[in-house]
């Protein structure tokens, strides 16, 4: 890669985040379906690269156990099983043959090195993989602190007052990475309380006192009824209502790579 520190979108909630000499992958899913075996929503867009093409990865972050985030085929075939794995409580059992698996409770932090610390924080979400395991494993967000830069990886989440509390304790945040798609589930209900709309994502970032907000979790799988390309349009159009310049409400194209320096530029 060209940059010492960068963020690259592979698709959905899968990102490669390079911070100095450390490469992080998030919620990686490379399967064609977001479900068990061959079932579940099919991909609308292919991942930016194949699993065997990803660069050497040092840290693997998993936010929760839903099929579009915890993809067992990808976990089994992940080429870097010596990576440090950070997962919510009770999800470590899925990472057989991995050498360094760390289950985390909310507000628990792990120091990676002298320049990098990762804290697991609450999210407005839930967990489930079968008919009998609803909310039996934890879920959450990851706060990545690299030198003097704070990146909050918030996916999946709905809107809640918890973000004002997080903003007071950990803010201001430099970059909030948050879901902006999969919110329209009519006729069951008008919108998901567990997935922010583009406007709610901006509200979360506002509560966090975030400088930049990067919208994700759209354009990859058809998970709900809104037009698949609607989220980034609404996200950009409504930025100023929540105190952001349009240029600070950021979306990538799948496969796009941007240096941390360019993302943070005023």
Per-region residue spans from a language model:
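Pre-active-site segment of Zn-dependent metallo-hydrolases
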Residues: 1-4, 10, 14-62, 72-77, ...
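Metallo-beta-lactamase
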Residues: 4, 84-149, 234-256, 260-264
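Catalytic core of the metallo-beta-lactamase
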Residues: 14-20, 112-174, 192-200
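Divalent metal-coordination and catalytic microenvironments
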Residues: 17, 27, 64, 71, ...
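Active-site metal-binding loops of divalent metal-dependent hydrolases
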Residues: 28-30, 65, 123-124, 155-157, ...
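Glycine/Thr-rich phosphate-binding loops of Rossmann-like dinucleotide-binding domains
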Residues: 34, 70, 95, 128, ...
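Cap/insert and terminal regions of metallo-dependent hydrolase folds
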Residues: 54, 59, 84-86, 90-93, ...
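Metal-dependent catalytic neighborhoods of phosphoester/phosphodiester hydrolases
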Residues: 71-80, 223-233, 261-262
């Amino acid at each position: 890669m060209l940059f010492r520190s960068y963020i690259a979108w592979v698709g959905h909630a899968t990102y490669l985040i390079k911070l100095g000499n450390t490469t992080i992958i998030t919620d990686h899913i490379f399967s064609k379906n977001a479900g068990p075996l061959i079932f579940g929503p099919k991909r609308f867009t292919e991942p930016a690269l194949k699993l065997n093409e990803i660069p050497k990865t040092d840290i693997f972050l998993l936010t929760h156990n839903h099929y579009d985030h915890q993809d067992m085929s990808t976990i089994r075939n992940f080429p870097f099983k010596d990576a440090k794995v950070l997962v919510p409580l009770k999800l470590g059992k899925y990472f057989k043959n991995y050498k360094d698996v760390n289950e985390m409770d909310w507000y628990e932090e792990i120091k990676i090195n002298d320049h990098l610390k990762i804290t697991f924080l609450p999210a407005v979400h839930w967990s489930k993989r079968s008919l009998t395991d609803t909310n039996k494993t934890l879920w959450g967000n990851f706060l990545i602190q690299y030198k003097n830069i704070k990146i909050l990886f918030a996916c999946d989440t709905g809107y809640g007052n918890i973000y004002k509390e997080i903003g007071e304790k950990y803010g201001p945040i430099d970059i909030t990475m948050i879901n902006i798609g999969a919110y329209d589930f009519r006729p069951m209900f008008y919108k998901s309380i567990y997935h922010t709309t583009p406007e709610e994502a901006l509200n979360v970032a506002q509560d966090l006192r975030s400088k930049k907000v990067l919208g994700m979790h759209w354009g990859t799988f058809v998970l709900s009824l809104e037009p698949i390309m609607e989220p980034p349009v609404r996200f950009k159009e409504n930025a100023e209502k929540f105190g952001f310049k349009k240029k600070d409400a950021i979306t990538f194209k799948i496969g796009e790579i941007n240096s941390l320096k360019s993302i943070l530029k005023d």
